[in-house]
Amino acid sequence: MKKHLLPLALLFSGISPAQALDVGDISSFMNSDSSTLSKTIKNSTDSGRLINIRLERLSSPLDDGQVISMDKPDELLLTPASLLLPAQASEVIRFFYKGPADEKERYYRIVWFDQALSDAQRDNANRSAVATASARIGTILAVAPRQANYHFQYANGSLTNTGNATLRILAYGPCLKAVNGKECKENYYLMPGKSRRFTRVDTADNKGRVALWQGDKFIPVK
């Protein structure tokens, strides 16, 4: 199942997940009609944190994706790329796509380097901050094609993305298996060329519903 989801790469060193920087959603999307995206991060700890952010382009957001070169140096920009985030504070990070306006969907890993700080020396003459704990967090940004073609096929409880942009698909209604209760719901990201079968919702039931999002547009399927 995870092969059809946009994954999170999360590596910790010297810090527990509960203490890590809150970077919001695992996967973010920039629709075809937008060239900017804002992402709010939050420091929920009681100490200041030094945040450094780096971007990598990926061949795929799936487990077998490799880091590849960008088409141009300023293909994807962000600001700020480095900041000191006080305790219990939040900050908005902005991303700007300036790459090719073609029919290709592009994927990027946002790498967040998070370091907790403590004052090593508190005298006014010589004060320095030293990292005492750190984390490396990876999230995914998918940039839809500037020339997006949304197409799909649905049959017998299975959706296939025949277009060139990732779809957010969902099904809701009676559960397929009684052990799961009466009402079930499924949500997935479906990349171009991929298929997905719903396994919890009884889509064959008259009350079973299937729908998807094409960018910001909601499309009922069944």
Curated annotation (Swiss-Prot):
Keyword vocabulary terms for this entry: Chaperone, Fimbrium biogenesis, Signal
Protein name according to UniProt: Probable fimbrial chaperone EcpB
Source organism phylogeny: Bacteria, Pseudomonadati, Pseudomonadota, Gammaproteobacteria, Enterobacterales
InterPro entries xref list: EcpB_C, Ig-like_fold, PapD-like_sf
Gene transcribed to yield this protein: ecpB
Pfam families the UniProt entry points to: EcpB_C
Keyword Nucleotidyltransferase: no
Signal peptide: 1-20
Induction comment: Negatively regulated by H-NS. Positively regulated by IHF and EcpR.
Top-level taxon: Bacteria
Record's function text: Part of the ecpRABCDE operon, which encodes the E.coli common pilus (ECP). ECP is found in both commensal and pathogenic strains and plays a dual role in early-stage biofilm development and host cell recognition.
Family affiliation: Belongs to the EcpB/EcpE family.
